[in-house]
Amino acid sequence: MTYDHIVIRYGEMSTKGKNRLRFVRCLKRNIAKKLKHFPNLQIEASRDRMYIRLHDTPPHPVIEKLQEVFGIQSLSLALKTESDLQKIKEATLFFVKQFPYEGKTFKISARRADKQFPITTNELNYELGSYVLKNTTGLTVDVHHPDIDVRVEVRKEGTYITAYDVPGAGGLPVGTSGKAMLMLSGGIDSPVAGYLAMKRGLQIEAVHFFSPPFTSERAKQKVIDLAQRLTEFGGTIRLHIVPFTELQQAIYKQVPENYSLIAMRRAMLRITDEIRKKENGLAIVTGESLGQVASQTLESMVVVNDVTTTPILRPLVSMDKTEIIAIAERIGTHHISIRPYEDCCTIFTPKAPKTKPKKEKIIQYEKFLPLDEMIAQTVARVETITLKPNEPLDELF
């Protein structure tokens, strides 16, 4: 006997009622893409569980990949046997013996998804527990706080035995909540915002504002690397690189310095919204955290938002910087974000940006610029790169 399956448990998907089948199909598709480099695996989906038949594939690399797939609450290594009482007893004993069990406590937690199984759940718990005790030494029962909790799930197609959970990424399968555009800078915050947006089922496309020669090719590459890392959680991502130099310089020439940052943010949002329309997105995601910097006061957000009616999603709005950094380190974007290359938001930062801007004033200042024409020209020159998981970056160019 050996572990031959991985059992996947759904999270919030279990509450989706009539839409559950759509969520399960999407999760299965995302898992299949994530595990495409393991050709021997077989994925079997049911209403409340998903099972991966290993076919002798080493399980731990598979589990590591699955932990990056949104929509999975937890997963476990499992042994599948026939739904025959003696077979279940033997498999349960084998499972317990995989642990250093002497001096430990255990519990049997049986569940009969197949109600035609000939004995009750309580009887099954008793039969299995007794069999384990008779065939081991130094093992005792503790039904409240066991060291080993052996779970036995009897189903029509067979019985699955598991003993410990590996936490999943949680959330909803990417693609079940529509598409949004992520405003992706080279900083710490926006990749985390993209990660959290994908966790809620959003498919994302990234928009980055590039201002050569003030920002370097290495700064551009940093953003490509960040987007590439995010593909490991959400699959293929299209990265739209916006040539922003001309428009940015015009803003800083014509708009008073203390309003220049607000004017720039409004222009960036308008451009992102135009790209969203072309790509059939439903929302825009930003890495803003309330009060973190001058452009992220509530008054500034209101004035910037005024240029669009598109929903602006801010997953980090109530987080402290330390919380954001902790997530960035956990998901593998922090070490990329801290590379010392400036982005367009930092090269022309005013000395005293307005923290409580007036909408009437910024509208008046914008009249000195042919903004509609410049935005249209900028959108027409956007460069788009398609990034896929597990793809070496040198193959993109």
Swiss-Prot record:
It is found in: Cytoplasm. It comes from the Bacteria. GO terms for cellular component: cytosol. The keyword Cell wall biogenesis/degradation does not apply. Residues 60-165 form the THUMP domain. InterPro entries: Rossmann-like_a/b/a_fold, ThiI_AANH, ThiI_fer, ThiI_N, THUMP_dom, THUMP_ThiI, tRNA_STrfase, tRNA_sulfurtransferase_ThiI. Its EC number is 2.8.1.4. GO terms for biological process: thiamine biosynthetic process; thiamine diphosphate biosynthetic process; thiazole biosynthetic process; tRNA 4-thiouridine biosynthesis. Pfam families: ThiI, ThiI_fer, THUMP. Pathway: Cofactor biosynthesis; thiamine diphosphate biosynthesis. Keywords: ATP-binding, Cytoplasm, Nucleotide-binding, RNA-binding, Thiamine biosynthesis, Transferase, tRNA-binding. Gene3D superfamilies: 3.30.2130.30, HUPs. SUPFAM superfamilies: Adenine nucleotide alpha hydrolases-like (SSF52402), THUMP domain-like (SSF143437). One of its GO terms (molecular function) is CCA tRNA nucleotidyltransferase activity. It catalyses: [ThiI sulfur-carrier protein]-S-sulfanyl-L-cysteine + a uridine in tRNA + 2 reduced [2Fe-2S]-[ferredoxin] + ATP + H(+) = [ThiI sulfur-carrier protein]-L-cysteine + a 4-thiouridine in tRNA + 2 oxidized [2Fe-2S]-[ferredoxin] + AMP + diphosphate; [ThiS sulfur-carrier protein]-C-terminal Gly-Gly-AMP + S-sulfanyl-L-cysteinyl-[cysteine desulfurase] + AH2 = [ThiS sulfur-carrier protein]-C-terminal-Gly-aminoethanethioate + L-cysteinyl-[cysteine desulfurase] + A + AMP + 2 H(+). ATP binds at M183, L184, H208, F209, R265, G287, Q296. Transmembrane segments: none annotated. Catalyzes the ATP-dependent transfer of a sulfur to tRNA to produce 4-thiouridine in position 8 of tRNAs, which functions as a near-UV photosensor. Also catalyzes the transfer of sulfur to the sulfur carrier protein ThiS, forming ThiS-thiocarboxylate. This is a step in the synthesis of thiazole, in the thiamine biosynthesis pathway. The sulfur is donated as persulfide by IscS. Belongs to the ThiI family. This is Probable tRNA sulfurtransferase. It comes from Anoxybacillus flavithermus (strain DSM 21510 / WK1). The lineage of its organism: Bacteria, Bacillati, Bacillota, Bacilli, Bacillales. The gene is thiI.
